[in-house]
Swiss-Prot record:
Cellular compartments per GO CC: cell pole; plasma membrane
Subcellular location: Cell inner membrane
Additional observations: There are over 60 methyl-accepting chemotaxis proteins in this bacterium.
Organism in which the protein naturally occurs: Paramagnetospirillum magneticum (strain ATCC 700264 / AMB-1)
Family stated for the protein in its record: Belongs to the methyl-accepting chemotaxis (MCP) protein family.
PANTHER family hit by this protein: LYSOZYME-LIKE PROTEIN-RELATED, METHYL-ACCEPTING CHEMOTAXIS PROTEIN MCPB
SMART domains on file: Cache_2, MA
Name of the protein described by the UniProt record: Methyl-accepting chemotaxis protein Amb2333
SUPFAM superfamilies cross-referenced by the UniProt entry: Methyl-accepting chemotaxis protein (MCP) signaling domain (SSF58104)
Length: 576
């Protein structure tokens, strides 16, 4: 359903004065002011016209009352008997006929019955019936005059009446007043066109004044509007440039004392604030650049230091792992040789036991057996010496392995120290990043990565330390086993020497053959037992050597992984 405002033409209800241009608003004020002034002028002109008309009417009323007083004088003369009624009326008619005012204005008298009694200008109307007389507008004006007198005794009547010198009747207003004693009314009128002429003259004078005032108002309004609009355009243009970031703009109008001056001053404050903000922004950007440069420099230094320390450690670990692998390989080979030689010694001991039993069973073959025993004892002695040498070498290799494991332990401790220092540097970097605020967030992430890498390094070195501890334990066992092998081989050498001495004494003490054979059998049994122990120890040493070899390979792999991780981390740090 449409409201009344929606039916207004041109969508007036949608108009909002806030969307008008400032010049249009000033024009609206001027127009409204002029309309108000025009309304006031129109009211004043209407009042002026009414006042002019009222003044003429009052003047006419006064002169008619004067004429009425004159006629009244004659009425009193007739009533007092000083004059007859006819004489008094004739005297009154003569007096009224000759009376003039305002130069040409006159009076007339007609009876209340509608007959003209006297008319100085129109003598042709004397005695005529006036009741049917109409003006060009069709008004029975004499009848109206009689009605006014009968009703109110006096009053004004307007009508159209010919004016001397003019072809057409003009508006006229007459004042009439009744004379009851004689049944007359006396009247006089004024032409309204005189009032209109005077009114038009006043209108022209006032119009000239109003026109001058209007022109002055328009000129002043135009000047004020131009001053305000130019000031507003200057201020808004400067503010728009300030909003676009141009702080070099100069807005004119600081000296103004009006609201535009206040606006310009506020814009100047905004410009100074913008300059301050721009300068602060540039300073913050410079601080961020310096912080970024310092961060990059610090990261580069940390990366270089970390690279130098970690790579040195990794190289040391790799070299140590290589040496440990070589040592383990050599130890495994030596242990294998020792195992083989132990097996040979065991076979020789078994052969010796068989020979001793053969000597006990066949004494008659003692000479030949003694020679065979001598040969076997010599061979056993040689094998025992070789076993001693192999055991000594194995002992040296294992001790070298133990020393290598100790050096690896030192390297692991060095890696742990570096990881601790790296963790401490990461903690310091985290603190510095927290101090740097937003600019240090990226650095904090890097510091956390460094700390995480240090933790992984510490964990890897701990695992390496455990492996090295296991190697050291196994190496210690191998050293003990090798020492036992050495002792056993030493005892075997002593037994072999004893067998040799017994063989040399066979010729001199045959009676002690049985005892020596039993002793030789016991010695052979013991040698066989110790050789079996040596073989088991050698097998265990071989297993330990292989474990050591695997640990060395694992250590080398861990060191390579550590080096790759450090290289990748340093690459990421340098790329930031």
């Amino acid at each position: 359903m449409e409201g009344p405002y929606q039916r207004l033409p041109w969508g007036i209800w949608r108009m909002s004065i806030s969307n008008w241009r400032f010049r249009a608003k000033i024009f609206l004020i001027v127009v409204l002011s002029l309309l108000g002034m025009g309304a006031i002028v129109a009211v004043n002109l209407a009042n002026l016209h009414n006042e002019l008309m009222a003044a003429r009417k009052i003047k006419t009323q006064h002169v008619v009352e004067t004429a009425h007083s004159l006629i009244g004088h004659y009425v009193k003369l007739s009533q007092s008997g000083q004059m007859s009624t006819d004489a008094a009326q004739a005297a009154a008619i003569e007096a009224i006929k000759t009376m003039r005012y305002a130069g040409t204005e006159y009076f007339w008298i007609n009876s209340l019955a509608g007959k003209m009694v006297v008319h100085p200008i129109r003598p042709d109307m004397l005695g005529k019936d006036l009741m049917g007389l109409k003006d060009p507008a069709g008004k029975l004006f004499f009848e109206a005059m009689i009605d006014v007198v009968k009703k109110d005794k006096a009053g004004f009547v307007d009508y159209l009446w010919p004016k001397p010198g003019l072809d057409q009747p003009v508006p006229k207003v007459s004042y009439v007043k009744g004379i009851e004693e004689w049944g007359w009314l006396v009247g006089s009128g004024i032409y309204v066109d005189d009032v209109d002429s005077a009114f038009r003259a006043e209108v022209m004078n006032l119009g000239g004044i109003v026109t001058g005032v209007v022109l002055l108002v328009l000129l002043v309004s135009w000047w004020i509007g131009k001053n305000v609009v130019d000031g507003m355009r200057n201020a808004t243009g400067g503010i728009r440039k300030l909003a676009e970031g141009d702080t070099s703009v100069e807005i004119k109008g600081h000296e103004r004392g009006d609201e535009i001056g206040e606006l310009v001053q506020a814009a100047e404050i905004f410009r100074e604030h913008s300059l301050t903000m721009k300068r602060m922004s540039e300073e913050r950007a410079e601080q961020r650049r310096q912080a970024e440069a310092e961060r990059r420099s610090t990261l580069a230094g940390l990366a270089t230091e970390l690279e130098r320390g970690v790579k040195s450690t990794v190289v040391t670990v790799s070299e140590s792992a290589g040496r440990m692998r070589s040592t383990a390989t050599g130890m495994a080979g030596a242990i294998d040789n020792a195992s083989q030689e132990s097996q040979a010694v065991a076979a020789a001991a078994q052969q010796t036991s068989s020979n001793v039993e053969a000597v006990a069973a066949a004494a008659e073959e003692l000479s030949s057996s003694i020679r065979g025993i001598g040969s076997q004892v010599a061979e056993s002695t040689q094998i025992a010496k070789e076993a001693v040498d192999a055991a000594n070498r194995t002992d040296g290799v294992v001790r070298g392995l133990s020393e290598a494991a100790d050096r690896i332990g030192e390297v692991v401790r060095l890696i742990n120290d570096i990881a601790g220092q790296t963790n401490l540097l990461a903690l310091n970097a985290t603190i510095e990043a927290a101090r740097a605020g937003e600019a240090g967030k990226g650095f904090a992430v890097v510091a956390n990565e460094v700390k995480h890498l240090a933790s992984q390094t510490a964990k890897a070195t701990e695992e390496i330390g455990q492996q090295i501890a296991s190697i050291q334990s196994t190496t210690a066992d191998a050293v003990g086993a090798i020492e036992s092998i050495g002792k056993t081989i030493g005892r075997m050498d002593e037994i072999a020497n004893a067998i040799a001495e017994a063989v040399e004494q066979q010729g001199a003490a045959t009676q002690e053959i049985a005892r020596n054979v039993h002793e030789a059998a016991d010695g052979a049994q013991e040698v066989s037992h110790h050789i079996s122990s040596i073989s088991r120890t050698a097998s265990e040493a071989g297993v330990a050597a292989r474990e050591l070899l695997g640990a060395a390979a694992e250590l080398a792999g861990e060191s390579e992984t550590l080096r790759n991780g450090v290289d990748r981390f340093l690459g990421e740090v340098r790329a930031m």
